[in-house]
Amino acid sequence: MAVFRLSELAEQIGATLKGNADLAITSIAALNNAEPTHITFISNAKYRSQLSQSKAGAIIVTAEDVEFCQATQNLLIVKDPYLAYALLAQYMDDLPKSANEISESAVISATAKLGKNVSIGANVVIESGVELADDITIGAGCFIGKNTKIGARSHLWANISVYHNVEIGSDCLIQSSAVIGSDGFGYANDKGRWIKIPQTGGVIIGNRVEIGACTCIDRGALDPTIIEDNVIIDNLCQIAHNVHIGFGTAIAGGVILAGSLKIGRFCQIGGASVINGHMEICDGAIITGMSMIMKPITEKGVYSSGIPAQTNKEWRKTAALTMNIADMNKRLKAIEKQLTE
């Protein structure tokens, strides 16, 4: 178990240290469960009442939080405790490092190009023309299709399928069972018979992109599906063919993006939202969970259409009223007409 001096942690996050600089810290813990060898943080003012009672060895706080702490508590004072927590979590991360070995059970084409310090797990299949840069980890059971390129320091967890002609940038993290580059849902209809359209466009994923478990990103029909740098995508998302996701956008779990949708930079899309295709979402749009977006968004702001939960009795009344809106509107117009005559 690694041990960190409190002064070392303060330096990592640029914090002002109040208390014992030599305190030994072993890990990060939640505010209400932390022990004397733990460091914790507070990022929501409603938990200030717990500060003075915390058993944590040290607490990451803002200057405004200090008055709620005991004088004897060790504090790291920063502007943004949640950001500080994220940085410390990275610094203290004890995730086992890859062994930089290639499993004997891996099947690797003779034409594939492997960089330095590449780790390839059991039963991996790497087809012809694949290029893997330095310090890449490919987890057990992954499939990497023909002519795919993966950038330096990217990490693919187990059982990921990356189809042919896909480009994945540097420092990417892809969680288990994701599928990158499967066919887009493209068909022509001939008198009721569906004619499949080969999807030849591929997928281009930028640098520092994270993709959650079981997320599917379809290849483009002609041009590629594009995920720009610094995008984060949660689990169980469906990214259809020719979608273009802009720099720094965050997409929560269960989101469905229809084909040829273009999403701007720094957008945030809440879980289980559905967005129509062949349109654009402007930079900086925030879409709350369970929203259904059917028209383009042209102005930065917060957009919602999800229905908050009610008791079943209340919901049934609301649903009944909704079903009668057209009739109520017709009756209202008739009354207005009578009043004006």
UniProtKB/Swiss-Prot annotation:
Active site: H241 (proton acceptor)
GO CC terms: membrane
GO terms assigned for molecular function: N-acyltransferase activity
Catalytic activity, EC: 2.3.1.191
Catalytic activity line of the entry: a UDP-3-O-[(3R)-3-hydroxyacyl]-alpha-D-glucosamine + a (3R)-hydroxyacyl-[ACP] = a UDP-2-N,3-O-bis[(3R)-3-hydroxyacyl]-alpha-D-glucosamine + holo-[ACP] + H(+)
Keyword tags: Acyltransferase, Lipid A biosynthesis, Lipid biosynthesis, Lipid metabolism, Repeat, Transferase
InterPro entries according to UniProt: Hexapep, Hexapep_transf_CS, LpxD, Trimer_LpxA-like_sf, UDP_GlcNAc_AcTrfase_non-rep
Pathway involvement of the protein, from the record: Bacterial outer membrane biogenesis; LPS lipid A biosynthesis
Gene Ontology annotations of biological process type: lipid A biosynthetic process
Pfam families: Hexapep, LpxD
Domain of life per record: Bacteria
Functional summary from the UniProt entry: Catalyzes the N-acylation of UDP-3-O-acylglucosamine using 3-hydroxyacyl-ACP as the acyl donor. Is involved in the biosynthesis of lipid A, a phosphorylated glycolipid that anchors the lipopolysaccharide to the outer membrane of the cell.
Family: Belongs to the transferase hexapeptide repeat family. LpxD subfamily.
Subunit architecture: Homotrimer.
Protein's recorded name: UDP-3-O-acylglucosamine N-acyltransferase
Species classification: Bacteria, Pseudomonadati, Pseudomonadota, Gammaproteobacteria, Pasteurellales
